[in-house]
Amino acid sequence: MTTPQDIIRRDVLAMTSYPVPDASGFVKLDAMENPYPLPEPLAAALGERLAQVALNRYPAPRPAALLDKLRHAMGVPAGCEVLLGNGSDEIISMMSMACAKPGAKVLAPVPGFVMYELSAKLAQLEFVGVPLKADLTLDVDAMLAAIAEHRPAIVYLAYPNNPTGTLYDDADIERIVAAARHSLIVIDEAYQPFAVRSWLPRAAEFDNVVVMRTVSKLGLAGIRLGYLVGSPAWLTEFDKVRPPYNINVLTQATADFLLDHLDVLDAQAADLRAERTRLAQEVAALPGTTVFPSAGNFLLVRVPDAAAVFDALLTERVLVKNVSKMHPLLAECVRLTVGSPDENARLLAALKLALPG
């Protein structure tokens, strides 16, 4: 009798599924979500819009009106195309699949977004991780050396980086782009609503650079919509491996509606940036903590005992992310999503109970 073990790849059999904890009843500060719902009148208007969606029809594979609205709203440079994905994760998978020649490699700073490595390995690409410096800034010399040695097909630069919050220096990125002429440079701006800089306006300057974004961190994580901006030469090829109906009709309608109300989402992002500053100051004042600078909607914090702090917060019904086992540079670190003022107050109260002194 045939079993899964007879058919499925050995590396897949050795894997575990990506863990997503049940957050029911918790203050949920583990996944970098916007804590704010839509204002009630806007939510009601969206509901009316969604009630008109033809659920019996397949979605438009390339929704022209939505793409045009997205280009205008996000300031996509002339000469660039836009490719939609079911979240950034699908775009990463499409790029991995399209670039998966025998012996090809993917390179990224580590610690970084886990999907770069996971997607590469699923496409049977070799992943090369280049450690950050001890202060979690980019080790440019190590990156340049690794690029010269490995000649990767894809180089990912998260801008800012998750889970560290680091916003790499533009001059350093320019050096990497110049050195990696044989590579595709993917600048991942998932957390751009909380950063002060963007590479999107420069996407047309370089023939080997694409910029990836998502609407998740802006406040729309539930609709799973990511987009890639870059040269038509690249996006035409990636479009060939895109599932034909990958963006469902409800996601398309929601995005089309809310792109007309970006002022609401931008105001929420501004509130979260202010909360980030306040929260960082208050956490840094707690005994035994080190708060790393962050340009995202989260804080990376080193504590005396990450596992103990994580468990103590769970007892107080506050869920954060213990990242201390992800990489040696993250030893005794937890990642705290910036929540609403009330959520942050509960987090601070729980941290005061969890930290000795």
Curated annotation (Swiss-Prot):
Cystine bridges: none
Cofactor(s) required for function per UniProt: pyridoxal 5'-phosphate
Pfam families linked to this entry: Aminotran_1_2
Catalyzed chemical reaction(s): L-histidinol phosphate + 2-oxoglutarate = 3-(imidazol-4-yl)-2-oxopropyl phosphate + L-glutamate
Pathway: Amino-acid biosynthesis; L-histidine biosynthesis; L-histidine from 5-phospho-alpha-D-ribose 1-diphosphate: step 7/9
Highest rank taxon of the organism: Bacteria
Protein name: Histidinol-phosphate aminotransferase 1
Species: Burkholderia lata (strain ATCC 17760 / DSM 23089 / LMG 22485 / NCIMB 9086 / R18194 / 383)
